[in-house]
């Protein structure tokens, strides 16, 4: 667990692969080149050793991408509680702006054709190339846990290094929700993500704070306020 998030197991040595894993390449590649391996042989057959990669436990479930925003200037709303040397201090407001899931070619339809072994014998390999984004709302009972994870992520970012100002603005928790209704966070993107594109007119989540609030407008809003000297203070 890191920053309050439960994460899939990461393997450092491909020889340790003894069950389904997903191999991902570094950078925002839209899923291109990712592949599933069940053992070292699978890994060697598909890996591009010239690229930096991560081997991660493959978790079955629904993938949801949670778009949050952290505003260090706001003193109202859901306040992130500091930890460590920031314990007892409010660091700023956390907002859930929107949520999406990704359409991926061709893994979303692969299961209809048979087992992975059979398909590979036929020369077919699943791919995870992102082709689109769909708006999502999740079960309300999952929202408290979503905020706990996001709050822990922001609080932990203030402790990454001395004098750190933490993670400011938009970020995305890339998650899997299992059939036991548990979150696994497989990646954190400290930026605006493409999944926010369906919400240029706002979302059911952002409308709680202000109607028609997109991630882009939220960035513009806090940037505008930060230019007013009387409102800017990073002292903790």
Model-derived segments and spans:
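Active-site nucleotide/adenylate-binding loops and adjacent lid/helix of ATP-dependent enzymes
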Residues: 1-101, 136-156
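A short beta-strand motif that forms the metal-chelation/ATP-contact edge
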Residues: 22-24, 67-68, 181-192
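Gly/Ser/Thr-rich loops at beta-strand to alpha-helix junctions
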Residues: 28-30, 172, 193
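Active-site-proximal flexible loops/turns
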Residues: 31, 64, 181, 194, ...
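A short glycine-rich, hydrophobically flanked beta-strand micro-motif that places a catalytic Asp/Glu
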Residues: 67, 161-180
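ATP-dependent carboxylate/phosphate-activation module, predominantly the ATP-grasp catalytic core
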Residues: 68-158, 189-220
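Conserved active-site beta-strand-loop modules that form the wall/rim of enzyme catalytic pockets
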Residues: 95, 173-174, 181-186
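Cysteine/selenocysteine-centered motifs that mediate thiol-based redox chemistry or coordinate metal-sulfur cofactors
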Residues: 217-236
């Amino acid at each position: 667990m890191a920053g309050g998030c439960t994460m899939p197991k990461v393997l450092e040595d491909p020889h340790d692969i003894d069950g389904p894993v997903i191999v991902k390449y570094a950078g925002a590649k839209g899923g291109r080149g990712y592949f599933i391996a069940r053992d070292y042989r699978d890994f060697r057959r598909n890996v591009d050793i010239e690229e930096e990669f991560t081997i991660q436990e493959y978790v079955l479930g629904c993938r949801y991408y949670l778009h949050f925003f952290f505003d260090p200037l706001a003193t109202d709303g859901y306040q992130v509680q500091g930890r460590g040397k920031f314990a007892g201090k409010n660091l700023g407001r956390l907002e859930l702006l929107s949520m999406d899931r990704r359409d991926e070619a061709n893994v979303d339809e692969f299961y209809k054709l048979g087992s992975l072994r059979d398909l590979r014998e036929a020369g077919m390999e699943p791919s995870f190339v992102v082709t689109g984004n769909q708006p999502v709302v999740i079960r309300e009972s999952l929202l408290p846990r979503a905020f706990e994870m996001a709050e822990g992520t922001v609080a932990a970012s203030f402790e990454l290094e001395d004098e750190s100002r933490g993670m400011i603005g938009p970020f995305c928790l890339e998650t899997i929700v299992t059939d036991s209704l548990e979150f696994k966070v497989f990646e954190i993107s400290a930026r605006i993500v493409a999944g926010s594109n369906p919400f240029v007119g706002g979302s059911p989540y952002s409308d709680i704070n202000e109607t028609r609030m997109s991630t882009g407008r939220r960035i513009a809003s806090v940037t505008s306020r930060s230019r007013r000297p009387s409102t800017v203070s990073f002292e903790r």
